[in-house]
Amino acid sequence: MAKVHILDHPLIQHKLSLIRDENTGSKDFRELVEEVSMLMAYEVTRDFPLQDVEVKTPVATMTAKAIAGRKVGLIPILRAGLGMVDGMLRLIPTAKVGHVGLYRDPETLKPVEYYCKLPTDVEERDLIVIDPMLATGGSATAAITFLKDRGAKSIKLMCLIAAPEGIKEVQNYHDDVDIFVAAVDDYLNDHGYIIPGLGDAGDRLFGTK
């Protein structure tokens, strides 16, 4: 069974509280999501292997450490996942960015795909699927299935907050995908919203309703 990693660093938790606050406007919301995403990326990449490299400093030559040739792909689930990309690219600037467009049918709460653009070599990359909310788990599960169908072998899922129902859904279908979250909330309401949650992440990021 894949692991659920709850990233409880004080900076992440402090900024997450500001993100949740209904009085936080779109500009601050975007900046906070970017900052938390960058901090979370630090933990998501913790298991990247290192290799020895020779480095010449101004005073001596030494053996230093460098990431051992990992090719990373960031896969935001549109549209809210876009708000997390820039923060992660600040730490992993060489990552390729693909996009999976899914929306949740308001009647069935099931994901519907409407767009996909991926790096051509997904099978060679460590992919990180990013979406602020893991609610029903339908969109994340569909996106991961979509990536596996195209040859992806290494996938992680990173979300700001998750509902227990969403975690269970992903684990039921993809027990090889580790899940990284800043918080696990209480439950989903009848409309599929995480409680207490943070509202609609896409609307708050982009100032829409």
Swiss-Prot record:
Alphabetical keyword list: Allosteric enzyme, Glycosyltransferase, GTP-binding, Magnesium, Nucleotide-binding, Transferase
UniProt note on regulation of activity: Allosterically activated by GTP.
Top-level division of the source organism's lineage: Bacteria
Molecular functions per Gene Ontology: GTP binding; magnesium ion binding; uracil phosphoribosyltransferase activity
Top EC group: transferase
Annotated 5-phospho-alpha-D-ribose 1-diphosphate binding sites: R79, R104, D131, P132, M133, L134, A135, T136, G137, G138, S139, D200
Pathway where it operates: Pyrimidine metabolism; UMP biosynthesis via salvage pathway; UMP from uracil: step 1/1
The reaction(s) this protein catalyses: UMP + diphosphate = 5-phospho-alpha-D-ribose 1-diphosphate + uracil
Binding site for uracil: I194, G199, D200, A201
Listed cofactors: Mg(2+)
Gene Ontology terms: biological process: UMP salvage; uracil salvage
Gene3D superfamilies reported in the protein's UniProt record: 3.40.50.2020
Pfam families associated with the record: UPRTase (PF14681)
EC number: 2.4.2.9
Co-factor note (free text): Binds 1 Mg(2+) ion per subunit. The magnesium is bound as Mg-PRPP.
HAMAP family: Upp_B (MF_01218_B)
Family: Belongs to the UPRTase family.
Function: Catalyzes the conversion of uracil and 5-phospho-alpha-D-ribose 1-diphosphate (PRPP) to UMP and diphosphate.
Protein name from the UniProt record: Uracil phosphoribosyltransferase
Biological source species: Desulfitobacterium hafniense (strain Y51)
Classification of source organism: Bacteria, Bacillati, Bacillota, Clostridia, Eubacteriales
Gene: upp
